[in-house]
């Protein structure tokens, strides 16, 4: 254990301020970051890592992008927080509406975290419908509110005394539309909203089967329940317009975060006006935040989104993904090792399972011990993947060919080592 991490353990539970950072799922001592730039970070022991976590997908442009850093420095001279509506909020809202192609009958509410945004989405759904039940899907993560922490691996982090929240939340298997439809046929009149990730990133990368997302939204329309699409991960990453644009759907409520803040804390709820105007002060459903719409986060976010709009940005990202991951897929296929590499829109996951998972139960069939050995080998070579078998890793526009070539070789060698192919 490093000296700094030992000191961190004196002050923070588990030495961290968010559980997965402790790296217990991969059985390593977590690095303590000293600095970061582009696609790499350097730890307190002066070891350099190629970063495929990127602040959990927030840094699609890499660490310390010069345009974002310059904008933040200039903005800081005008103040770090006002507690009042700022010009920066309005300018950023205009940028988002233009980027997403939102119609004029939409509105947005800025917040600071994804958890705040999903909590607000659920509060809107319950407040407007007067119904108690929220449906989510097993393995999908929507923040740390008790409403969402119903099943393992999250339930142990929620106080047992708050189990009263659980009867108001139903968790169903992802991608099982017949079961979802059966439940909605029975309980739909009590369901305020259904929240879902369009592409799962918190049980590894799991894609929706054809028709699942569309079916969920259509069923919500039929029962008068709100469809809540959590695009905290996929928004601004998988395409301009996010997953909603890719799947050609219009959920009632959209939730954004991560990339939205350009590396600073920012999130947002986006809905048609007739939904959003139920929020205070226009309506009676309360939501507030001291740092909501923080001017520095708005500035960083505006630059981040503007960079995503540059000509060929997503084509470049797709090329990076293809060049980096295709040779690894080829190695897995030709050697016949029991590993499945799932990728989508610059997200990717290694499942130590010969079959592509469709839900949490499938993902949990993976060989966790083999994943740990693979992860430890890659880590020792200076390749930092997201430190859990059930978390997505991320590519960024900042990943250079040199870094990708090195990491590709390191990951293939690590797979060979785990399965004794060398």
Curated annotation (Swiss-Prot):
Major place of residence: cytoplasm
Obligatory cofactor(s): pyridoxal 5'-phosphate
GO biological process: protoporphyrinogen IX biosynthetic process
One Pfam family here: Aminotran_3
Modified residues (N6-(pyridoxal phosphate)lysine): 258
Enzyme class name: isomerase
Domain of life: Bacteria
Isomerase is among the record's keywords: yes
Localisation: Cytoplasm
Keywords linked to the UniProt accession: Cytoplasm, Isomerase, Porphyrin biosynthesis, Pyridoxal phosphate
Reactions the enzyme catalyzes: (S)-4-amino-5-oxopentanoate = 5-aminolevulinate
Gene Ontology MF terms in the entry: glutamate-1-semialdehyde 2,1-aminomutase activity; pyridoxal phosphate binding; transaminase activity
Pathway the protein takes part in: Porphyrin-containing compound metabolism; protoporphyrin-IX biosynthesis; 5-aminolevulinate from L-glutamyl-tRNA(Glu): step 2/2
EC number(s) stated in the UniProt entry for this protein: 5.4.3.8
Gene Ontology annotations for the cellular component aspect, listed alphabetically: cytoplasm
Family to which this protein belongs: Belongs to the class-III pyridoxal-phosphate-dependent aminotransferase family. HemL subfamily.
Subunit structure: Homodimer.
PANTHER family (UniProt xref): GLUTAMATE-1-SEMIALDEHYDE 2,1-AMINOMUTASE, GLUTAMATE-1-SEMIALDEHYDE 2,1-AMINOMUTASE 1, CHLOROPLASTIC-RELATED
Protein name (Swiss-Prot/TrEMBL): Glutamate-1-semialdehyde 2,1-aminomutase
Species this chain originates from: Chlamydia trachomatis serovar D (strain ATCC VR-885 / DSM 19411 / UW-3/Cx)
Species classification: Bacteria, Pseudomonadati, Chlamydiota, Chlamydiia, Chlamydiales
């Amino acid at each position: 254990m490093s000296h700094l991490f030992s000191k961190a353990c004196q002050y923070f539970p588990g030495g961290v301020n968010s559980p997965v950072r402790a790296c217990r799922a991969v059985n390593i001592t977590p690095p303590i970051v000293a600095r970061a730039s582009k696609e790499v970070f350097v730890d307190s022991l002066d070891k350099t890592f190629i970063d495929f976590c990127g602040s959990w997908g927030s840094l699609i442009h890499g660490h310390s992008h010069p345009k974002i850093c310059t904008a933040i420095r200039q903005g800081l001279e005008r103040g770090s927080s006002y507690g009042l509506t700022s010009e920066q909020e309005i300018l950023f809202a205009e940028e988002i509406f233009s980027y997403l192609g939102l119609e004029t009958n939409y509105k947005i509410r800025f917040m600071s975290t994804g958890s705040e945004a999903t909590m607000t989405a659920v509060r809107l759904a319950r407040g407007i419908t007067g119904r108690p039940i929220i449906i989510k899907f097993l393995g999908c993560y929507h923040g740390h509110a008790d409403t969402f922490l119903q099943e393992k691996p999250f339930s142990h982090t929620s106080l047992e005394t708050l189990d009263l929240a659980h009867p108001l939340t139903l968790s169903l298997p992802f991608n099982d539309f017949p079961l979802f439809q059966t439940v909605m046929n029975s309980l739909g009149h009590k369901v305020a909203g259904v929240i879902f990730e369009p592409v799962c990133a918190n049980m590894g990368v799991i894609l929706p089967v054809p028709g699942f997302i569309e079916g969920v939204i259509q069923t919500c329309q039929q029962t008068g329940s709100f469809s809540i699409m959590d695009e905290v991960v996929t928004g601004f990453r998988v395409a301009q317009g996010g997953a909603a644009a890719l799947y050609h759907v219009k959920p009632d409520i959209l939730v954004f975060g991560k990339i939205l803040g350009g590396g600073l804390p920012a999130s947002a709820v986006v809905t048609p006006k007739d939904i959003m105007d139920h929020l205070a002060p226009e309506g009676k459903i309360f939501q507030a935040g001291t740092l909501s719409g923080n001017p520095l986060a708005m500035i960083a976010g505006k630059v981040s989104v503007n960079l995503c709009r540059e000509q060929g940005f997503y084509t470049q990202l797709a090329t990076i993904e293809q060049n980096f991951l295709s040779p690894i897929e080829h190695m897995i296929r030709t050697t016949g090792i029991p590993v499945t590499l799932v990728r989508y829109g610059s997200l990717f996951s290694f499942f130590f399972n010969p079959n592509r998972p469709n839900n949490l139960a499938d993902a949990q069939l993976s060989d966790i011990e083999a994943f740990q050995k693979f992860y430890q080998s890659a880590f020792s070579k200076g390749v930092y993947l997201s430190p859990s078998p059930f978390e997505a890793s991320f590519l960024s526009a900042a990943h250079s060919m040199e870094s990708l070539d090195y990491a590709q070789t390191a990951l293939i060698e690590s797979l060979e080592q785990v399965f004794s192919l060398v």
